[in-house]
Every structure is written in C-alpha cells, then in structure tokens.
C-alpha cells in the first residue's frame, strides 16, 4: 500500500514556504502570529 506522505522539498516550499506565506494576507498573519509567539523558525523553508 502506498503511503500518503511522499516528501518533496519543492512542493513543501511552494505551499508552506516563506514566499508562499508572504503572498497572501492570511499568510502574513500566520507569520505575524509566529513572530509574536517567538518561534525560531517561522516557516518550513530554510
């Protein structure tokens, strides 16, 4: 049986990366929340 998680760095960054977050208003809200919380890593991208 094929598993559901087939890792791909490109797909990961396109959907959850920093530039993807910055592209929408809600994505920017996500970053703002994570900054306020003090997260070391704001997004999955390096």
From Swiss-Prot:
Highest taxon listed in the record's lineage: Bacteria
Sorted UniProt keywords: Ribonucleoprotein, Ribosomal protein
A Pfam entry, by short name: Ribosomal_L34
Cysteine-cysteine disulfides: none
Single GO MF annotation: structural constituent of ribosome
Record PROSITE patterns: RIBOSOMAL_L34 (PS00784)
GO cellular component: ribonucleoprotein complex; ribosome
Biological process according to GO: translation
Gene3D superfamilies according to UniProt: 1.10.287.3980
InterPro entries per record: Ribosomal_bL34, Ribosomal_bL34_CS
NCBIfam families: rpmH_bact (TIGR01030)
Family in the record: Belongs to the bacterial ribosomal protein bL34 family.
HAMAP family assigned to the protein according to its UniProt record, in alphabetical order: Ribosomal_bL34
Protein's name according to its UniProt entry: Large ribosomal subunit protein bL34
Organism of provenance: Photorhabdus laumondii subsp. laumondii (strain DSM 15139 / CIP 105565 / TT01) (Photorhabdus luminescens subsp. laumondii)
Lineage: Bacteria, Pseudomonadati, Pseudomonadota, Gammaproteobacteria, Enterobacterales
């Amino acid at each position: 049986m094929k598993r559901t998680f087939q890792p791909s760095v490109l797909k990961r960054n396109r959907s959850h990366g920093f530039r993807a977050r910055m592209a929408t208003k809600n994505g920017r809200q996500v970053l703002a929340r994570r900054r306020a919380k003090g997260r070391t890593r704001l997004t999955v991208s390096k």
